[in-house]
């Protein structure tokens, strides 16, 4: 099956599933197992998802395993968008460093029928890693355009307290993610 058969939905169609007509979205993140390991409140992600199906949310941020595990529930709630986390990040013991990798591809996302792919953009890492993350995002954006798949960059400061300095720095990384 070629790109045309699998990529039958346009980017605008997918974006309109994620965002309401007023361009607002409320997405429930339940993809943190890839980065944070076991999170007590998220140990049963499909159960968490079920709690929100009748609420005023537009969709869920999920991992590949959650996409597969929630197919029945989301088939019964087709209005819910799915944003697939296609990368993961693990902090290392060295200050200002970590390691990240892709764990799924844009083609995987298309085959799973999700509406958007999401990558992390850790900003409290060294400059070399920032460049690597931006390069990875650029590569994914290029691949996603072939499949008409929207891409979300999630700017994050990992393991950083919510100080005024971090909040100010988040404005910078949010602008980088937007651009």
Residue ranges and their predicted role:
Residues 20, 25-29, 33-77, 81-91, ...:
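Alpha/beta enzyme core
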